[in-house]
Amino acid sequence: MSTAILVSLLRNGRCQVNRGALTLCFQKEHSCTTSTRHCFSANRRCFSSRFDLDGSGRPATWDSFGIWDNRIDEPIQLPPSIKYGKLIPHINLSKVGCSTQLGKRKENEDRFKLARLTPDILYFAVYDGHGGASAAEFCDRFMEDYIKEFLVEEHDMEKVLVKAFLEINKAFARHAHLSVDASLLTCGTTATVALLRDGIELVVASVGDSRALLCRRGKPFKLTIDHTPERKEEKLRIKKSGGFVTWNSLGQPNVNGRLAMTRSIGDLDLKSMGVIAEPETKRVKLQHTDDGFLVLTTDGINFIVNSQEICDIINQCHDPKEAAQVLTEQAIQYGTEDNSTAIVVPFGAWGKHKSSEVSFSFSRGFASSGRWD
């Protein structure tokens, strides 16, 4: 498809266009005389037209867009498509799947959030609190505001997220020291935040062990690495700061005998021991012909379901809402004791890499869990 088509539509005042409109424009620009470039089928809703979709030199068909021929029908964003030279589908927040399960805990300390921060930027986040839900609740309420504030003066989303994490930790510290609730000094939370600009520029920042992964061609592409004392550089920082690492009865390392992570928001009593709030970040340009979805998960899922299983479970589902629900319920069936939360964001190849039907067992041991995948 030529850029002229997209420019023409944009000049006519359209910022989004559905599949039918694009098909009509394509038909107008290209005659049907060249059989090698057009393939019509009577049993399909629309014709399939071959063109270089992603600049790779490989021809693609309309089927390459999973969302167009697989259960989710979203319009194309014209300005970003022209800017990046490839078709970029609109990400509708109402189609994003979210689910949280209590598990065997008395309280759900997980929080999740999704929002449109600007006309071009979407926000997705999961927070897994420990020692109470106060730190997770604080991030859930205020992280969005910090990010919005810093986006005004900074275009680089990685820098924005790093600054937002550090500032919200300072704000929580001020809040805790002014509170009469002493538990605020020892509670904390993980934070995994994803920003998506123009439907194609994805940036993820994280502290703790909540995860983000991209399903690309049916395989997991990890966007985060758990911050645990098992990581050599993390353990070294803890020791240099005067902290220490011990192992519990399950063989899991803990900072100063109490915290399973080396980075977090909160945990103010351990900040001087090397537990920092600075996130690690990852920047990715989406490939909508290959990328099926983004999923953010807390450790109630990650501890017991590995990354490939997460992709397989979601790829068997009809839509993201069902996928988030099934994933959190599967973690419960596997025997997780923790709260489990998932956000599933569909991309262009949703449904394209559908897994073969797999029967999942209702229980498993630590050896098969996702903590070590």
Curated annotation (Swiss-Prot):
Residue ranges of domain PPM-type phosphatase in the record: 95-347
Record localization: Mitochondrion matrix
Mitochondrion is among the record's keywords: yes
Known cofactor(s): Mg(2+); Mn(2+)
Residues at which Mg(2+) binds: 128-129, 338
UniProt lineage: Eukaryota, Metazoa, Chordata, Craniata, Vertebrata
EC number of the protein: 3.1.3.16
InterPro entries: PP2C, PP2C_BS, PPM-type-like_dom_sf, PPM-type_phosphatase-like_dom
UniProt protein name: Protein phosphatase 1K, mitochondrial
Source species of the chain: Xenopus laevis (African clawed frog)
Catalytic activity: O-phospho-L-seryl-[protein] + H2O = L-seryl-[protein] + phosphate; O-phospho-L-threonyl-[protein] + H2O = L-threonyl-[protein] + phosphate
Recorded GO CC terms: mitochondrial matrix; mitochondrion
GO BP terms: regulation of intracellular signal transduction
Enzyme class: hydrolase
GO-annotated molecular function: metal ion binding; protein serine/threonine phosphatase activity
Chief location: mitochondrion
Pfam families on file: PP2C
Cofactor note: Binds 1 Mg(2+) or Mn(2+) ion per subunit.
Keywords associated with the record: Hydrolase, Magnesium, Manganese, Metal-binding, Mitochondrion, Protein phosphatase, Transit peptide
Domain of life: Eukaryota
Family: Belongs to the PP2C family.
